[in-house]
């Protein structure tokens, strides 16, 4: 029995020893495995942190983009809403269109004293005030021919009024919208005309400059009629020409039509940068370009103009005017398109009312750069006026 159990015991001990040895190896292996896993976790943590920072940066960038797009969309919606609201505002408040047509609230140049035309280089000009109607007062400038500038120094209004009866023709100048009779380009034209030997009488319509009253087409026309009659009462048999520029061409044709109807026409009519009628001009004006193709453009924008009594129908007036007509227009005019001036000429030239009178259209090439208000710079202007006004008498039929 002892011999049998001894090997078993030894085997058991060997197994125990072997088990003890294998247990130590397993523990060592386990420790190594744990160390490896820890190192892997540490390594993983080190690589995960940059990915996490990158993701956060991308999220912030996307957030900023979304915020920017939201603000941009909000701005676009506001602009679109404003764009759509304006036509309805104009339709509901037609007085807005009248303001935009007249622009009498725009006084350029600023800070000039209209009582002192000499401050604008017009040292042979007198400032008057006339009263066409009750509660309406208009400021007037009278510039005499430049050859008299020395004699004019220190003279009073009476002297200037008497000078109208001298042997010099008179031009009644009707300016356009915005600004005053002291506008830079207007003053330069007065100087040119004065140097050619003309008296120049100009004024600010009611509501412009220092003139008192509320602007309207009827009122502007009546102011012009009052000044014309005032000139005729003092000028004897001297020729009186009417010169209208831009919106002033509408006043000019209204005035001349009334004068022809009462059989006291002027000696000639000069239209600088004219249009056919206010509807066509408003539709062609650069201000209207963003709405020109807006659905219902005429109903929203043009009908309120005519419903306010503003027509300035030069094309219609041409049928009732009987006096020499000269039209001046620059091809590069950005305000009143050249084609409207040409169209007006094509209406006037064959009209029966002009059959006994000279009708002339003078274009100025776009290369000259005269645009809307610089035709006075043309060195050809004196010749054009001399040739035309020298033929301003009715042509006899043969």
UniProtKB/Swiss-Prot annotation:
What cellular component terms from Gene Ontology apply here? AMPA glutamate receptor complex; cytoplasm; dendrite cytoplasm; endoplasmic reticulum membrane; membrane; mitochondrion
**Extracellular side of membrane:** 96-398
Q: Where is the active site?
A: 246 (nucleophile), 333 (charge relay system), 372 (charge relay system)
**Where is the region Disordered?**
1-24
Q: Which UniProt keywords apply?
A: Endoplasmic reticulum, Glycoprotein, Hydrolase, Lipid metabolism, Membrane, Mitochondrion, Transmembrane, Transmembrane helix
**InterPro entries, from UniProt?**
AB_hydrolase_1 (IPR000073), AB_hydrolase_fold (IPR029058)
Null mutant phenotype: Mice are viable and were born at the expected Mendelian frequency. Young mice (less than 6 months old) are mostly normal in their behavior; however, as these animals age, they develop an array of phenotypes, including defective auditory and motor behavior, with concomitant cellular pathology indicative of a neuroinflammatory response. Mice show heightened immunological responses. Metabolomic characterization of brain tissue show striking elevations in a series of lysophosphatidylserine (LPS) lipids that occur before the onset of neuroinflammatory and behavioral defects.
Q: Tell me which EC number(s) this protein carries.
A: 3.1.1.-, 3.1.1.23, 3.1.-.-
**What compartments host this protein?**
Endoplasmic reticulum membrane; Mitochondrion
SUPFAM superfamilies in the cross-refs: alpha/beta-Hydrolases (SSF53474)
Question: What's an example of a GO molecular-function annotation for this chain?
Answer: lysophospholipase activity
Q: Give me the segments passing through the membrane.
A: 75-95
Write out the topological domains of type Cytoplasmic: 1-74
| Ranges of compositional bias, category Basic and acidic residues | 1-15
Reaction catalyzed? 1-(9Z-octadecenoyl)-sn-glycero-3-phospho-L-serine + H2O = sn-glycero-3-phospho-L-serine + (9Z)-octadecenoate + H(+); 1-(9Z-octadecenoyl)-sn-glycero-3-phospho-(1'-sn-glycerol) + H2O = sn-glycero-3-phospho-(1'-sn-glycerol) + (9Z)-octadecenoate + H(+); 1-(9Z-octadecenoyl)-sn-glycero-3-phospho-(1D-myo-inositol) + H2O = sn-glycero-3-phospho-1D-myo-inositol + (9Z)-octadecenoate + H(+); 1-(9Z-octadecenoyl)-sn-glycero-3-phosphoethanolamine + H2O = sn-glycero-3-phosphoethanolamine + (9Z)-octadecenoate + H(+)
State the activity regulation. Selectively inhibited by DO264 (N-3-pyridyl-N'-(1-[3-chloro-4-{2-chloro-4-(trifluoromethoxy)phenoxy}pyridine-2-yl]piperidin-4-yl)thiourea).
Q: Report if keyword Ribonucleoprotein is assigned.
A: no
Q: What does this protein do?
A: Lysophosphatidylserine (LPS) lipase that mediates the hydrolysis of lysophosphatidylserine, a class of signaling lipids that regulates immunological and neurological processes. Represents a major lysophosphatidylserine lipase in the brain, thereby playing a key role in the central nervous system. Also able to hydrolyze oxidized phosphatidylserine; oxidized phosphatidylserine is produced in response to severe inflammatory stress and constitutes a proapoptotic 'eat me' signal.
Record's protein name: Lysophosphatidylserine lipase ABHD12
Provide the gene name from the record.
Abhd12
């Amino acid at each position: 029995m002892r011999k049998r159990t001894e090997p078993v015991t030894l085997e058991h001990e060997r197994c125990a020893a072997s088990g003890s040895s294998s247990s130590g190896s397993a523990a060592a292996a386990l420790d190594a495995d744990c160390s490896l896993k820890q190192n892997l976790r540490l390594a993983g943590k080190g690589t995960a942190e940059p990915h996490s920072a990158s993701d956060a940066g991308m999220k912030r960038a996307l957030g900023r983009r979304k915020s920017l797009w939201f603000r941009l969309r909000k701005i676009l919606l506001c602009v679109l809403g404003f764009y759509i609201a304006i036509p309805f505002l104009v339709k509901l408040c037609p007085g807005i269109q009248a303001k935009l047509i007249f622009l009498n609230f725009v006084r350029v140049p600023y800070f000039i004293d209209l009582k002192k035309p000499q401050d604008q280089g017009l040292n042979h000009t007198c400032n008057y005030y006339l009263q066409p109607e009750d509660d309406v007062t208009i400021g007037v400038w009278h510039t005499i021919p430049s050859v008299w500038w020395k004699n004019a120094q220190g003279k009073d209004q009476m002297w200037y009024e008497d000078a109208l009866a001298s042997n010099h023709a008179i031009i009644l100048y009707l300016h356009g919208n915005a600004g005053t009779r002291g506008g830079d380009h207007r003053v330069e034209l007065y100087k040119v005309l004065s140097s050619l030997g003309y008296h120049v009488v100009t004024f600010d319509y009611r509501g412009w400059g220092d003139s008192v009253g509320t602007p309207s087409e009827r009122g502007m026309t009546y102011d012009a009629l009052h000044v014309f009659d005032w000139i005729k009462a003092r000028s004897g048999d001297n020729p009186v020409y009417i010169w209208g520029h831009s919106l002033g061409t509408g006043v000019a044709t209204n005035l001349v039509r009334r004068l022809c109807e009462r059989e006291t026409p002027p000696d000639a009519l000069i239209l600088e940068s004219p249009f056919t009628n206010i509807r066509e001009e408003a539709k062609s004006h650069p201000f209207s370009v963003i709405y020109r193709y807006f659905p219902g453009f005429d109903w929203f924008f043009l009908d309120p103009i005519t419903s306010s009594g503003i027509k300035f129908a030069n094309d219609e007036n041409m049928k009732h005017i009987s006096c020499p007509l000269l039209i001046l227009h620059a091809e590069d005019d950005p305000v009143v398109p050249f084609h409207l001036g040409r169209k007006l000429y094509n209406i006037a030239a064959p009209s029966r009312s002009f059959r006994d009178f000279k009708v002339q259209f003078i274009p100025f090439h776009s290369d000259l750069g005269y645009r809307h208000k610089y035709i006075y710079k043309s060195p050809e202007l004196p010749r054009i006026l001399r040739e035309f006004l020298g033929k301003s008498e009715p042509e006899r039929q043969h």
